Design a protein with these regions (language model features):
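Domain-edge interaction signal
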Residues: 1-151
């Protein structure tokens, strides 16, 4: 089991009015999976293992946690204080939470593959994920490069 309470606290800080209806919305489940994956990439160890699935990174352990806490997840009913490290990640997540589900899919896939800073990231994603538009992938890569940086 991971630390879903930390993930939810970070999301609440990043976007206080965020709602994730994981019981009824596939897109909301996808968004939460991608948010947590990106938090991990930002250096926050939440204890979830991710595998590659059709729509990008997926953690069965995270799915178990959010289904077991569906009401807490939906309204972000959490009152936990963030540590300094968590607050830094939450600040960066403010831009991430504004991405659409398909943009999140593109960004998380690029991160999973290690392509964020590659010149041909757009072409690579287009080849493996042809259902994503060029605009979605470009926006995702742009946000990713701003938020996570390139080394």
């Amino acid at each position: 089991m991971g630390n879903i309470d930390i993930a939810l606290s970070v999301l609440k800080y990043a976007k206080p009015d965020l709602r994730l209806d994981i019981k009824n919305s596939f897109d909301d489940r996808l968004r939460l999976q991608k948010y947590v994956f990106i938090m991990e990439k930002l250096g926050l160890n939440l204890g979830y293992d991710f595998n590659e699935y059709l729509r990008g990174p997926y953690s069965p352990g995270l799915a178990m946690d959010y289904y077991g806490n569906a009401d807490t997840v939906k309204e972000l009913k959490i009152s936990r204080e963030l540590t300094n490290e968590e607050r830094k990640v939450a600040e960066k997540m403010k831009e991430i939470v504004e991405l659409t589900p398909t943009e999140l899919e593109a960004l998380s896939y690029v991160l999973l593959k290690g392509w964020l800073c590659d010149d041909d990231a757009l072409v690579n994603v287009g080849f493996y994920k042809p259902h994503l538009t060029v605009n979605e992938v470009e926006r995702a890569i742009g946000v990713g490069r701003r938020v996570l940086g390139c080394k």
